[in-house]
């Protein structure tokens, strides 16, 4: 059975809409190039902003942009009183140092929760802004009354935006967590041990039916596109049909992630 994120999105949207009436909220998005998955994400952000009355400024830069120009753009947004949250859209061209650029964002405007300061708060279990997609995964599981505590959770993917912070957040929920990746030996066997499997590898239909079992909950974080522009997740359709519950793509984690981005903006704006 497929599970969706629309109801969770609507709950967060109402919270954000109310805050937008009370405090100044301004989101800046810096985009480099025209990656299809990032364009889809930005479309979702625009729509959410329109529905909640939040100001969004999008800075579009070419693939060939230099790091110095990007740093200047970030600096200007850091100093803007109209902007309370900044997002650097990834992936970035290989010529740019993503970590250096993300950490140039004022941590008080780090709407994605991936600045080293905010990741440090996650590691030390201090209150702070959490990365959006991991927040979305936890929100989806809890909204559908899926037990996390005591469960075996396998995460395929170890990025600093999804896999690694999600492992910490799942551990904080008292799950037993295994982090895998494309070079994990016996990946199929590791996946099959899971009660909850999270696919965050960024490869189209990477998780196949022989990697899941009928009692498993599968959360698909992936946003990929086929040759015809159809959105596909990291989980193959046959795998979704073979497990107990699976998040939909589209309409699953992606729509909650956008909402969680604005929820983070709400938190930062109230502190500004």
Curated annotation (Swiss-Prot):
NADP(+) binds at residues 157-159, 182, 223. It comes from the Bacteria. Pathway: One-carbon metabolism; tetrahydrofolate interconversion. GO terms for cellular component: cytosol. Its EC number is 1.5.1.5, 3.5.4.9. GO terms for biological process: L-histidine biosynthetic process; methionine biosynthetic process; purine nucleotide biosynthetic process; tetrahydrofolate interconversion. The keyword Hydrolase applies. Keywords: Amino-acid biosynthesis, Histidine biosynthesis, Hydrolase, Methionine biosynthesis, Multifunctional enzyme, NADP, One-carbon metabolism, Oxidoreductase, Purine biosynthesis. The keyword Nucleotidyltransferase does not apply. It catalyses: (6R)-5,10-methylene-5,6,7,8-tetrahydrofolate + NADP(+) = (6R)-5,10-methenyltetrahydrofolate + NADPH; (6R)-5,10-methenyltetrahydrofolate + H2O = (6R)-10-formyltetrahydrofolate + H(+). Pfam families: THF_DHG_CYH, THF_DHG_CYH_C. GO terms for molecular function: methenyltetrahydrofolate cyclohydrolase activity; methylenetetrahydrofolate dehydrogenase (NADP+) activity. InterPro entries: Aminoacid_DH-like_N_sf, NAD(P)-bd_dom_sf, THF_DH/CycHdrlase, THF_DH/CycHdrlase_cat_dom, THF_DH/CycHdrlase_NAD-bd_dom. PANTHER family: C-1-TETRAHYDROFOLATE SYNTHASE, CYTOPLASMIC, C-1-TETRAHYDROFOLATE SYNTHASE, CYTOPLASMIC-RELATED. HAMAP family: THF_DHG_CYH. Homodimer. Belongs to the tetrahydrofolate dehydrogenase/cyclohydrolase family. Catalyzes the oxidation of 5,10-methylenetetrahydrofolate to 5,10-methenyltetrahydrofolate and then the hydrolysis of 5,10-methenyltetrahydrofolate to 10-formyltetrahydrofolate. This is Bifunctional protein FolD 2. It comes from Syntrophomonas wolfei subsp. wolfei (strain DSM 2245B / Goettingen). The lineage of its organism: Bacteria, Bacillati, Bacillota, Clostridia, Eubacteriales.
